[in-house]
Design a protein with these regions (language model features):
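Canonical Rossmann dinucleotide-binding motif of NAD(H)/NADP(H)-dependent dehydrogenases/reductases
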Residues: 1-28
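Conserved glycine-rich Rossmann-like NAD(P)H-binding loop of the short-chain dehydrogenase/reductase
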Residues: 25-41
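The beta1-alpha1 cofactor-binding region of Rossmann-like NAD(H)/NADP(H)-dependent oxidoreductases
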Residues: 36-37, 55-66, 99
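Substrate-binding pocket helix/loop in short-chain dehydrogenase/reductase
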Residues: 93-94, 98-106
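Active-site helix of classical SDR
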Residues: 117, 153
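Residue(s) in the substrate-gating loop at a strand-loop-helix junction
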Residues: 137
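C-terminal helical subdomain
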Residues: 177, 197-235
Length: 260
């Protein structure tokens, strides 16, 4: 029976690239988003018989219930991989961004991932060797100035991923996260003035991340990692922060985020 993946935020950007990667590998694809026009385009590209689409606000648990129940039937009762990709961000000084916007970032980026994992659990249990892939970020390494609430949300995703990977091990479910730096998508439009973007540039594209998701989903060895940094820059930064004392990690972060 064909393996099946369900992806949130799949109408454009990273989510769309992930959907196309899995479709290219012969999987049945479930794609969810609020952008129904983008979903229709994706379904046309993959083929209606190989793609299920649904409108989904990831912060709404009831919508998750309906979406996954419908996907389960359409996929032949399989959920091999859940990709929690949907997310939003706002850049700028923390105190200048409205509190409601900060709360919306947490609702989508954290509550949406929690709702997805919670709702998907019984389906994952019924599918042997299933995997959850949560889209985190290099911002989960060290709190990033100018992206305070976004970075906070990705730290939460990191913690949830680590906890569930241990908690669900008895059920044979792996839970992993992907850590890209800045990626060439609509999400980074307007971020060119952010000091960390000036320092590091935007080197990754959506296909780089999609390939990392595919690799992580199929990397199920006992020694396989939980977190997957994407790209050389991210891997070097991750190693530097791991090996550096706290004061040096803070200094590195300040240097990357400095206007000077």
């Amino acid at each position: 029976m064909k393996q099946a993946v369900f992806i949130t935020g799949a109408a454009a950007g990273i989510g769309r690239a992930v959907a196309l990667e899995f479709a290219h590998q012969g999987w049945f694809v479930g794609a969810a988003d609020l952008d129904e026009v983008g979903l229709a385009s994706l379904k046309s590209e993959i083929g209606a018989e190989r793609c299920f689409t649904t409108a989904l606000n990831v912060a709404d648990a009831k919508q998750w219930d309906k979406a996954l129940a419908s996907f389960w039937k359409a996929s032949g009762e399989r959920l091999d991989v859940l990709v929690n990709n949907a997310g939003i961000l706002s850049a700028g000084a923390f105190h200048e961004i409205p509190l409601m916007r900060h709360q919306a970032i947490i609702d989508i980026n954290v509550s949406g991932v929690m709702a997805g994992c919670h709702t998907a659990y019984p389906y994952l249990c019924k599918t042997p060797k299933s995997t959850v892939i949560n889209m985190a970020s290099a911002s989960a390494m060290f709190g990033q100035p100018g992206l305070a609430s976004y970075s906070s949300s990705k730290f939460a995703v990191r913690g949830l991923t680590e906890a569930l990977d241990c908690e669900w091990a008895e059920q044979g479910i792996r839970v992993k996260s992907i850590w890209p730096l800045f990626v060439q998508t609509n999400m980074v439009v307007g971020l060119d003035k952010l000091p960390s973007v000036k320092s590091l540039g935007i080197k990754l594209n959506v296909d780089d991340v999609a390939r990392a998701v595919w690799y992580a989903a199929n990397d199920r060895g006992e020694t396989s990692p939980i977190h997957y940094p994407v790209g050389l820059q991210t891997k070097v930064l991750n190693l530097a922060i791991k090996l550096s004392p706290a004061w040096m990690s803070r200094w590195i972060n300040q240097r990357m985020s400095s206007e000077h």
